[in-house]
Amino acid sequence: MDAQDEDNPFTNLETTVDVTEEIQDWRFLSNVEKDQGTYTIPKRGQKDFEPDGTNKQHSALDLSRKAMFDALSVERLISAKHAIIATWNAQNGMSCVEKAHGPLFKTMGTADSQNRMWLLPEETLYLVERGSMECWSEEGLPMSLQAVYSASIPLCGSLENYLVYAHLRRCGFSVIRSNLVPVKEDEYRCDSKIMNFKDLLFLGLGKASQILQTFNFRKLAFPFSKRRRQSILLHDTFYTYEEVYHDLQIVRGYVPIACNLITSSDSLFQITFHAYKPSASFKKSALSEPDFRICVVSSQDTLLPTIFEIDALFSSTPLRQNMPQHMFQRLKEGYRNIIIAIVDYGVISYIRLSDVCFEEKVYTDFSKKGSKRKRVSKKFQQLV
């Protein structure tokens, strides 16, 4: 989930062309015969770009558009023995599959004593949306995709939760719901808080203090005076380099202590999903430590987390037992890290937050081979 170097848009400006901006030529789909039960994926043809005003281009676009709609209108057929039918249980808020088969159920659903597979709302909606399963009501009526959406989304916690779940599943991850996911059956969108006069007053005073801190009143009063360049160090006399680096530290390093996990149901930032990388040894009955812990938030009703909210989020995450050997990898991942999935009107962005303690004193490590550095004498004085 980390950004790769080849994804950098500035590495090769000549070859970064978005093919989705081009109008596709869908006329090759007209070769698909509707009366056949099996289809083969046809080869892609040439692309038709924006209309240029000519009748030839207009006719080509009409034929391409008609071929696309004709291909979408083809009735998809499936044999009865391969069909997966689920029954929606409104009382439990889950769907039940009597006969589950296929590789998808290796990472989805929970089996009971009667060998029935129970699916969570997001799992049910994902399988119905991708066309792998049909969902029926308890009355024996087939449910449309819109009906499954209306029944499942409130039980998923929010629409953003399902969007992130479906995206991770399409990327190949095995996604397990965390026990901390909030479920709101009636209304799953929080209204924004209305600020009163007291809140506005403190907000104005805070903004005013920030503006005043940016001014240099001494320079405004004496614009032509020359001042001696000051050091960023607090002291003037040092005897070792360790004292210099210790004085330069703004936030002191610390060693994390393993303690009981603290969870808070009031915070907007909570672990929503546990994501696992694709692996043949993955078992739902014996889950290991997840590769990623996902916290889903909406950009429309959620502000930037405060330091207290981030600390509470880290407090609900256990410490890593095996740290990476590479120093920069340890700085990147930290003792614990969380992926914040920000959903902005369907557009998902992932941000990693890591608990990096900076407890390693790299300036005292001179054990590398080939290094000509030596320890400084303790009589080193007057470093400014």
UniProtKB/Swiss-Prot annotation:
Cellular component annotations (GO), alphabetically ordered: mitochondrial membrane; tRNA-intron endonuclease complex
The organism's place on the tree of life at top rank: Eukaryota
InterPro entries: tRNA_splic_suSen54 (IPR024337), tRNA_splic_suSen54_N (IPR024336)
Chain's role: Non-catalytic subunit of the tRNA-splicing endonuclease complex, a complex responsible for identification and cleavage of the splice sites in pre-tRNA. It cleaves pre-tRNA at the 5' and 3' splice sites to release the intron. The products are an intron and two tRNA half-molecules bearing 2',3' cyclic phosphate and 5'-OH termini. There are no conserved sequences at the splice sites, but the intron is invariably located at the same site in the gene, placing the splice sites an invariant distance from the constant structural features of the tRNA body.
Chain intervals with Basic and acidic residues compositional bias: 45-55
Name of the protein: Probable tRNA-splicing endonuclease subunit sen54
Family: Belongs to the SEN54 family.
Subunit structure: tRNA splicing endonuclease is a heterotetramer composed of sen2, sen15, sen34 and sen54. Interacts directly with sen2.
UniProt-annotated stretches for the region Disordered: 37-57
Protein's UniProt keywords contain Phosphoprotein: no
